[in-house]
A protein has these predicted regions:
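Phosphate/NTP-binding elements of NTP-utilizing enzymes
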Residues: 2-241
Length: 241
């Protein structure tokens, strides 16, 4: 029996104005476990891509999707992306009537996509969960505990994606996540970005050596390693101890 991606992903029935980058597709095709942990550099397009992935899966499978952000406002950013995808697809296909609430989207097949923060009363919700930037939350442990409760049923999965932070609690929770046998762990650094060959619609490179050098000059060595090379500061401290 062949393993299947964590979430169904096809651009054929949900067209978008521009294709995603190959490295973003790998976040989907490389995920074969119930839990997916992506440690990524800043501004890698994770919210944007996962918004599409979740919408696609909800339309095809009827599964609920839940975006859990450090604040309700950060989760609602994903709702903006999804609304744009729906508008783009409307020019090519009929998706049916989609109901839009303040913090949710209800699809014609009954699937509901929620956008919540860690203080939300989410006990009654269930679905595939996307946890954005948990390492920068006031309590990473609390966010992850909420996500586990929301995605506990066998047919659901959880995706945790973040840039590393100096928070010791975040480092501890990250280690717990990747230690599980049911977890696929992935990393996407600035070096990976530069090697990806990703280009803009104009044909210009999205990431190149000049960009790498400019960013290194603007940040301290410690911040560069943490924010763009996905190195947890606590890992260096443990190795030095």
């Amino acid at each position: 029996m062949h393993s299947t991606p964590t979430n169904l992903m096809t651009t054929a029935s949900l067209p978008v104005d521009r294709p995603f980058f190959a490295y973003q597709h790998e976040w989907n095709s490389g995920a074969r476990s119930r839990n997916r942990v992506l440690t990524k550099m800043r501004q890698a397009g994770a919210d944007f891509f996962f918004a599409y992935e979740a919408l696609n899966d909800a339309l095809h499978t009827g599964r609920n999707q839940i975006f859990l952000g450090g604040t309700p406002a950060s989760a609602l950013t994903v709702k903006t992306y999804m609304s744009a995808f729906i508008d783009q697809a409307a020019a090519w296909t009929h998706l049916g009537k989609i109901k839009s609430g303040k913090a949710h989207l209800e699809l014609p097949n009954g699937a509901v996509i929620y956008f919540i923060g860690p203080e939300s009363l989410a006990a009654a919700l269930h679905g595939n969960v996307y946890v954005s930037e948990y390492a920068w939350a006031d309590s990473p442990r609390n966010m992850i505990a909420i996500a586990k409760g929301l995605s506990m049923h066998k047919r659901y999965h959880a995706t945790y994606y973040t840039t590393p932070s100096p928070n010791p609690e975040a480092w501890q929770e990250y280690q717990k996540l990747i230690a599980s046998n049911s977890t696929t762990s992935m990393t996407f650094t600035a070096d990976d970005a530069a090697a990806s060959g990703a280009t803009l619609a104009t044909g210009a490179a999205l990431f190149d050596d000049e960009w790498l050098n400019d960013m290194k000059k603007e940040l301290s060595a410690e911040d560069w390693k943490m924010l763009f090379m996905c190195e947890w500061p606590q890992a260096d401290k443990e190795q030095a101890a």
